[in-house]
Regions:
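Short, well-structured alpha-helical interface segments that form or flank functional binding sites
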Residues: 43-50, 54, 75-79, 95
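Acidic, serine/threonine- and proline-rich intrinsically disordered low-complexity regions
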Residues: 47, 53-56, 83-90
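Intrinsically disordered, low-complexity regulatory segments
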Residues: 1-43, 50, 54, 268, ...
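A generic structural signal for short, non-catalytic loop/turn and secondary-structure boundary residues
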Residues: 35, 73-75, 93
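A short acidic/basic microdomain associated with nuclease active sites
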Residues: 56-83
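Short amphipathic alpha-helical segments
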Residues: 40-48, 143-150
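Intrinsically disordered, low-complexity regions enriched in serine/threonine
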Residues: 1-6, 86-94, 100-274
Length: 274
């Protein structure tokens, strides 16, 4: 489940605790999942959100994973995206963000990452460790201060985003290079491309005029949006019953979203260096 405000403008609205509870109730868990280690010290993520608000961060989007095991429900991984109230958007195109990940089901500790939100497509991107490394914080009971410090550490590195976007924009890809990038991107969702409902080159199709172009930044954004939003299909492909394949579904799960976002950025970095 996901909740976000209408970010068609460059001013993201802060979401309330009521909205957070409605879409990511694991943020408000009052205890860890039974059976956690005795070294685990519980602290509700909601308290971290409150502390972030006091430091000038506003939560603008939240989501949680869909656990396979019912025992993990209510404790599963969740994500909150924050923007600074005093942060100025980069030329009205994107706003830098700090992303908080956590769970209370023994699967992970706190993770603080850099991200950005593009206004034109209303998509959130996540920055890979190769540019701005994530900061990990264990559940010790003293993590509020460590997480606040980590958020400002990430904030201090956010200017790298504008520089990297400029670098991506300066690189023009040939048709063959763009197609190879698309094939690698499709593999993030489908290990066997023959089982995908689309051809890799379909991921290169822009959804709006602003995303047209052959530069690395434009192509990265087209691939990211098409992989996550789905809705595309290869009308020439048939399923096992000889019928046309169904359109590619949108990504709803948090784990898959993380895999695609981080993986795609890493591929883009490799393309940039080559």
């Amino acid at each position: 489940m996901i909740i976000t405000n209408d970010r068609s403008s460059t001013h993201a609205l802060e979401i309330t605790d009521t909205e957070l509870m409605a879409t990511a109730p694991s943020i408000f868990a009052q205890a860890p999942m039974p059976g956690v280690s005795g070294r685990y010290t519980f602290l509700p993520t909601a308290r971290i959100v409150d502390a972030m608000r006091q430091e000038g961060w506003k939560p603008i989007e939240a989501r949680q994973s869909s656990p396979r095991l019912e025992a993990r429900r209510g404790y599963q991984m969740h994500q909150v995206r924050f923007q600074r109230r005093d942060q100025v958007a980069e030329v009205d195109e994107f706003a830098p963000e700090v992303i908080l990940l956590n769970s209370h089901d023994r699967s992970s500790g706190y993770e603080i990452r850099a991200g950005m939100f593009r206004f034109v497509c209303r998509n959130g991107l996540m920055v890979a460790d190769s540019l701005i490394p994530a900061i990990h914080v264990r559940h010790t009971g003293q993590e509020i201060g460590a997480i606040i410090q980590a958020s400002f550490t990430i904030l201090g590195q956010l200017p790298k985003l504008a520089d990297r976007v400029a670098s991506f924009r300066s690189i023009s890809l040939t048709n063959s290079a763009a197609r190879l990038f698309a094939e690698q991107a499709l593999a993030l969702r489908y290990q066997d491309p023959t089982l995908a409902p689309i051809r890799a080159e379909q991921l290169l199709e822009p959804r709006r005029h602003e995303d047209a172009g052959s530069d690395l930044w434009a192509i990265t954004n087209r691939l990211q949006e098409n992989l996550l939003r789905g809705g595309m299909r290869d009308t020439t492909r048939l399923n096992r019953n000889g019928r046309p394949v169904r359109p590619m579904r949108a990504i709803r799960g948090l784990d898959a979203n993380l895999k695609i976002n981080l993986g795609l950025w890493e591929i883009a970095e490799t393309v940039r260096l080559n």
